[in-house]
Amino acid sequence: MNRLTSLLIALVLVITASPALAQASPTLSALEIELWPEYDKPSVLVIFRGTVAPNVPLPATLSFEIPSKFTPLAVAYRDPQGLLYDLKYTTTAGANATAITFSAPTASFQFEYYDTTLDTTTPSRKFNFAWRTPYPIQALNVVVQQPVNASNLVTTPKTESSIGVDGLTYFKQSRSNVNANESITLDVAYIKSDSILTASTVKPPAA
């Protein structure tokens, strides 16, 4: 009887442990965070585009924090053909951050929000991006899109600049093998004397 009881206990432990193993913290193979100041609003459009690692079971339940003073604009997943589809999500408010939680049916996901603290009343404009990684990330890029008619864009830490296919200038910070709970910060400053939004000047891609 003691032997049978021991076997039953062992079986129960294995069964109850399995879900916990399945829910272990996932790894992201790639995450790109795009910061687009004055794109289609006098704010900073913040876009997260990520991909979970191949060994992460799908659907993958993910949770990301954004500052509590902002609200999610959209959450989506990307299908194998590259098309985006809206995704249901929940939010949990904290003292300083709001957690966005969703279940991604495919490896690729995207969510967006606006940083509405950008002051565009003076030519000297600046904003700060600060975020803490919830998961390990194999390849992380933070990309700033320079607004149309802006000049003297400076980032801290320094970034590499390049011209995109849309003719705009982009500044990129790249990191690899980022651990969970690491702090990611980027200060951005630039000069812009008008209120023209970038979206009103960028031509849509050719069909």
Protein language model annotation of sequence segments:
Residues 6-16:
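Bacterial N-terminal signal peptides
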Residues 1-2:
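N-terminal secretory signal peptides that target proteins for export/translocation
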Residues 19-207:
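Lumenal/extracellular ectodomains and adaptor appendage modules
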